[in-house]
A protein has these predicted regions:
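Catalytic-core regions built around general acid/base machinery
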Residues: 61-73, 95-102
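Active-site beta-loop-alpha junctions enriched in small/polar residues
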Residues: 22, 50, 81-85, 111, ...
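Glycine/threonine-rich flexible loop motifs
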Residues: 51-60, 88, 116-119
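Conserved post-catalytic alpha-helical subdomain immediately downstream of the catalytic base
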Residues: 167, 171-247
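Conserved phosphate/ATP/ADP-binding segment of small-molecule kinases
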Residues: 86-163
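Conserved N-terminal subdomain of the carbohydrate kinase-like
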Residues: 1-49, 231-247
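Hydrophobic faces of well-ordered beta-strands that scaffold small-molecule active sites
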Residues: 76-78, 106
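A short helix->loop->beta-strand "cap" motif at the edges of active sites that frequently abuts
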Residues: 68-75, 133-137
Length: 247
């Protein structure tokens, strides 16, 4: 089983993550071990840069999977999710660029665009140009402001190529952080849910932001929330809290 160890931080000491994934079952996965029905029934195939950076074998398998799912009509979603403990920015860029022509939805932070891909200018122009170069349908970029280890602001911006339109909303401010691990994945899950269920980038952004904000308040790296709570948080964010307790 692949695991990781997380050491909580406190300013000025940053949190630390140590990966232990060598010789895990995932590392030995082969393409022919996946039933053919999985490829034809999948609507969105999502993968991240962490997977590409684990090993050469998994890197190659991931590329095969992307091609296979793409050929079967799935939307390909990719989160850069750069981790310097796995590889350098240059190594990551070289490998990620290889798969971008097959990607439909890209998740990347503004820092990633500027540091890894060496892009300059306004983030909106960067996202628009990136979508044009690689024929990306949608690009999402999150923004996190760290007030302290226990107080964050979170927002995002989405660019939809077919409409040449950007979507954003007011940030979730002063989130009381219990555990930030997994909040990026929660954001991605919210956005992809919005795309799958609503086929609406603006609604997808709201689901993503709310999911990420909620995950910061939950211990562990899994977002244990339901759609009712998610919609309540979105409504309160847009119209203000109605009460201090839900009961």
């Amino acid at each position: 089983m692949a695991i990781y160890y997380y050491e909580y931080g406190a300013s000025p000491r940053k949190p630390r993550v140590t990966y232990d994934r060598l010789n895990s079952s995932f590392q030995s996965l082969k393409l022919n071990e996946i039933p053919e029905g999985v490829f034809s029934s999948t609507k969105i195939f999502h993968v991240s840069g962490i997977t590409l950076g684990l090993s050469k074998k998994i890197n190659e398998l991931t590329k095969e999977l992307i091609k296979k799912f793409k050929q079967n009509g799935a939307i390909i979603s990719f989160d850069v999710n750069f981790r310097k403990n796995l590889w350098s920015e240059k190594e990551a860029e070289q490998e990620i660029i290889k798969i971008l022509p097959d990607v439909d939805i890209l998740f990347a932070s503004e820092e990633t665009f500027r540091k890894m891909f060496q892009k300059k200018g306004e983030i909106e122009n960067i996202m628009r140009d990136f979508a044009k170069i690689y024929e990306l349908s949608l690009i999402s970029s999150t923004r996190r402001e760290v007030n302290s280890t226990t107080s964050h602001n979170f927002s995002s911006i989405i660019y939809e190529k077919k409409n040449d339109k950007f979507y954003n909303e007011d940030a979730y401010k002063n989130i009381e952080v219990i555990d930030r691990i997994g909040s990026g994945d929660a954001y991605v899950a919210g956005v992809l849910y919005g795309i799958l269920q609503e086929n609406n980038a603006e609604i997808a952004l709201k689901y993503g932001n709310a999911s990420a904000a909620l995950k910061n308040t939950i211990s562990g790296d899994t977002t244990c929330i339901n759609l009712t709570l998610l919609k309540e948080i979105i409504d309160e964010h847009e119209h203000g809290n109605s009460s201090e307790m839900s009961r």
